[in-house]
Regions:
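Single conserved hydrophobic/aromatic residue that forms the stacking wall/gate
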Residues: 2-7, 11
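Outer-membrane beta-barrel domain signature, especially the mid-to-C-terminal portions
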Residues: 311, 408, 450-468, 499-509, ...
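Acidic/histidine-rich, surface-exposed loop or edge segments in extracytoplasmic proteins
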Residues: 43-51, 256-257
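Gram-negative/organellar outer-membrane beta-barrel architecture
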Residues: 38-39, 58-299, 388-389, 395, ...
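C-terminal outer-membrane beta-barrel translocator/porin domains of Gram-negative envelope proteins
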Residues: 17-21, 30-35, 114-117, 230-427, ...
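C-terminal soluble interaction/assembly domains
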Residues: 52-56, 130, 458-459, 471, ...
């Protein structure tokens, strides 16, 4: 397929000297030549072209055209060539844009390793993909997935500490901003995609089984270099818990007797949310490669759920259903607001050594129709991406010391506020091995006081005394396409203890204070 951007619209094949044997059509003053049939809509081709007829040659326009066409998954490759209109007048150029069609359908099988905050596992999936559903390079994906994970930190109550997941999901991705009233000029200025998705997942944990059904409509776009935006315009999730283990149910019943807020995190719930995410990375995506120069990244995420449904229930004069609050089809809906801030700075000392600083803060506040956050929206501390002197989900909230028998602590050790601080020195050792020395600090807290999470509530005059501190060493395998990270952390300050036990750094004990972690990426 060739498009020539000029006023005369006379197009020649650069290889054969003519377009004999090609069909053609004209769209908005542009002639398009093709064989058999057009595999992309003419409007899409015009919208994704940045070269304008009658304007001065611009290398930037050429590169922007390559970049725009590169986002069309239906294309195998694109090539732009320029040729003088005639020998006597070298000031005018004809632009030839040659597009090669790629494979529009594919089936793939994937096997992957998983790492959920330090819990290791494996997953397998089979997917079907169609890259040109409506002749606009729309990508339809259907995937069936199964996963297994070994869970840590459950205590001794469970003989089976395995987690299994089965699910099916589908999505339809559009290579442009699909929203009414937006002009073509605006769409050309940003690199955007729109996606609608459906998903069903069945999860079986040792303590409960859970089913999740979701539907979403989201946008991703970039209007400047290094900046990414994501808008979840509508994200509807229904969480259904068909069964709970006897021990877990007994524990929840006990919570009910104590009027615990935690029990509300493990009930059926409808989550209708909107969210926005802003990401800036001065060095591009460095998650899977070692940075080579000083850089920094910033991520801000905000989301809300339930406000429109709560307002509609009020306007309709609905009656709350006891502790469930307002319901839709007898299903309570969650209402909360949540915000996350993440900043990381990498200082390159020299090509072999660097110093990294990171801070992460998260706050979520349930209100209105919710007494507590849904389980999947709560914060946890400890693990490979948090305070590495503690195993995953074993720290906090606040100064919570855990139950006397150590049972079910993984339920209680969650919160509404999270703080993570990290400083790390990195050095190249040899070959593909890098070493690191780190100091971590942080914890989680609850917003409301709960009898089951004693000393876990956030207080301004107390929280800084409850910040846990850890130190340790790590090894990184830089395999170019990914980084394997192994860390060993030791507790330095333990807010769960009092007296001399609060400062294990003064009397370190390996069996008590050490935690090992494996992760992918920095």
């Amino acid at each position: 397929l060739s498009i020539r951007r000029q006023r005369q619209m006379c197009i020649r094949d650069s290889r054969k000297g003519s377009f004999t044997g090609f069909d053609s059509l004209s769209y908005k003053g542009y002639n398009m030549y093709y064989k058999d049939k057009m595999f992309l809509r003419p409007k899409l081709l015009v919208d994704f072209n940045r070269i304008r007829p009658g304007e001065f040659y611009s290398e930037r326009d050429v590169q922007n055209t390559y970049s725009a066409l590169g986002r069309l998954r239906m294309l195998k490759y694109s090539n732009i060539r320029f040729k003088e209109v005639n020998v006597s007048d070298s000031t005018k150029l004809d632009a030839y844009i040659v597009l090669s069609k790629g494979q529009n359908k594919s089936v793939s099988f994937e096997i992957e390793g998983t790492n959920s905050a330090g819990d290791l596992g494996a997953a397998a999936s089979i997917s079907f993909q169609h890259r040109n559903v409506f002749k606009g390079s729309e990508t339809f994906t259907m995937k069936v997935r199964g996963a297994y994970e070994a869970i840590t930190g459950l205590g001794q109550d469970y003989v089976n500490d395995n987690y299994t997941e089965y699910g099916v999901e589908s999505s339809l991705n559009f290579p442009e901003f699909m929203f009414p009233f937006l002009s073509s000029d605006f769409k050309r200025k940003i690199k955007a995609t729109s996606e609608v998705g459906l998903k069903f997942t069945s999860q079986v944990r040792p303590e409960f089984s859970r089913m999740l059904a979701s539907a979403s409509w989201s946008y991703r776009w970039s209007d400047r270099k290094h900046i990414q935006h994501r808008l979840d315009l509508a994200d509807i999730n229904y969480v259904y818990m068909p069964s709970k283990s006897p021990d877990f149910q007994e524990y929840l019943d006990k919570m009910t007797a104590n009027n615990s807020l935690l029990r509300a995190s493990y009930e059926n719930v409808l989550i209708v949310r909107m969210g926005y995410n802003f990401t800036y990375n001065s060095a591009g995506n460095t998650m899977m490669r070692t940075p080579t120069k000083s850089s920094y990244s910033l991520r801000v995420n905000v989301e809300e759920a339930g406000n429109l449904m709560y307002a509609a229930s009020k306007l309709a004069h609905s009656t709350p259903k006891g502790d469930k609050g307002f319901v839709l089809a007898n299903i309570p809906f969650a209402q909360y607001i949540k915000g996350d801030f993440d900043f990381a700075k990498n200082f390159m000392i020299d090509p072999r050594n660097s110093f990294v600083f990171h801070i992460g803060v998260g706050v979520a506040y349930p209100y209105g129709n919710s007494r507590a956050l849904p389980f999947e929206k709560r914060y946890f501390s400890g693990g490979a991406n948090s305070v590495r002197g503690w195993s995953v989900r074993s720290l906090g909230p606040g100064g919570y010391k855990g139950s006397s028998d150590g049972q079910m602590d993984f339920i209680k050790q969650s919160g509404d506020i999270k703080l993570d601080l990290n400083v790390e020195y990195r050095t190249h050792l040899f070959w593909k091995l890098n070493g690191a020395a780190f100091i971590d600090a942080g914890n989680i807290w609850t917003i409301r006081s709960d009898s089951e999470q004693e000393d876990g509530v956030f207080k301004f005059n107390k929280f800084y005394k409850q910040i846990a501190v850890a130190y340790g060493l790590g090894i990184r395998f830089d395999l170019d396409y990914l980084i394997l990270r192994f860390d060993g952390g030791m507790k330095a300050i333990n807010p769960m203890e009092t007296g001399k036990g609060r400062y294990p750094i003064t009397r370190p004990r390996f069996s008590r204070d050490f935690a090992f972690h494996f992760a992918v990426g920095y």
